[in-house]
Regions:
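WD40-repeat beta-propeller superdomains and closely related acidic/aromatic-rich repeat-like regions
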Residues: 3-338
Length: 338
């Protein structure tokens, strides 16, 4: 284990934020229903909205804690973040130049106070959502920042990049530590529901588990034969779910460290995964749409077709009633349970 290394932060050019709104409605979409006897928590989803406004691929999505606002980040040199009201279907905010090029990842802190974004300009940017202003940039990474995670108490922010993993104090807005330097490229991060464990997935198919309070590596293991594109903890904290470019999704028992289930069904890379807050439904995204799985049985329940190209990002709302998706077709779609 390398020792903690303190890094620096700086404030950079102020991104532009303004608030606006227009009404959008759902585009054509289909739902393929696979006969199943398994119970469904996210039952009979229907397309509620289809948002247009980005100039490139949607790389990241996040809901506010009250599920009333959806935030989307655009890639391909767009660097724009857009905010959408999920009750009215209106766009209510835009942050131009949120990142100099692509917005690789974004999140809203669990307390709802802070929006965080990162990109391949090596910076992390913070906004105060209560007062609608830019607050600070964290600078310390020397390469593309690909992933973000925040602790349940909104105190610790973790960032993953081509040069490793760094930790930041989100409340005091200062750097905390560097866990790994110049390791494999960190594509995805997740923090356990109790805030004690950090999971990272890299471009070599390796997953590592860290003690978030000490920064010590608990264990690492080769999980997939290709890049780990997404990791997420189940709400009970007992299982880690990983998705990969090897086309598989795996469920890992955190007590034994063994695979409890392997889910197959995507015809290409698994780009993103998300778990409904009740822990019953897993969503996965790829070239062939969005697949909904019964997390207990591993059974494929439904496939949602709404995007005309790869689906690159998905997120469940905290109230468990909506699933948002973003794709290479530059659209953001919101599905609602009926």
């Amino acid at each position: 284990l390398r020792p903690y290394i303190i890094v620096a932060f700086a404030t950079v050019a102020l991104p532009v934020m303004f608030w606006e709104g227009f009404c959008v409605r759902a585009a054509d979409a289909t739902v393929e229903v696979i006969p199943s006897q398994a119970p469904q928590s996210f039952a009979n989803p229907q397309l509620l909205y289809s948002f247009s406004g980005h100039a490139g691929t949607i790389k990241s999505l996040a809901f506010s804690p009250d599920s009333n606002v959806l935030v989307s980040g655009g890639a391909e040199n767009e660097g724009v973040i857009r905010l959408w009201n999920t009750k009215t279907g209106k766009r209510v905010g835009t942050i131009r130049k949120a990142q100099k090029t692509a917005v690789e990842s974004l999140l809203i802190s669990p307390d709802g106070k802070t929006l965080v974004s990162c990109g391949n300009d090596n910076t992390i940017n913070l906004w105060n959502l209560k007062k609608n202003y830019f607050t600070r940039s964290f600078v310390g990474h020397t390469s593309n920042i690909l992933s973000l995670a925040v602790s349940p108490d909104s105190k610790v922010l973790v960032s993953g990049a081509l040069d490793g993993i760094r930790m930041w104090d989100l409340l005091q807005q200062r750097p905390l530590a560097t866990l790994v330097r110049f390791d494999n490229a960190i594509f995805t991060l997740a923090i356990s529901p109790d805030g004690q464990m950090l999971a990272s997935g890299d471009n070599k198919g390796v997953i590592k588990l860290w003690d978030l309070s000490t920064g010590k590596l608990i264990r690492g293991f080769t999980a997939h034969s290709n890049t780990v594109s997404a990791v997420v903890f189940t709400p009970d904290g007992k299982t880690l779910v990983s998705g990969s470019r090897d086309r598989t999704i795996k469920l890992w028992n955190l007590n034994s460290g063994e695979v409890s289930k392997t889910l197959t069904g995507h015809d290409n890379w698994v780009n993103a995964i998300a778990i409904n807050p009740d822990g019953q439904t897993l969503a996965s995204a790829g070239r062939d749409g969005i697949k909904l799985w019964n997390l207990t049985t591993g059974e494929l329940i439904k496939t949602l077709y709404g995007h005309s190209d790869w689906v690159s990002a998905i997120a469940f709302s905290p109230d468990g009633q909506m699933l948002a998706s973003g794709g290479f077709d530059k659209k953001v779609q919101v599905w609602r349970s009926q």
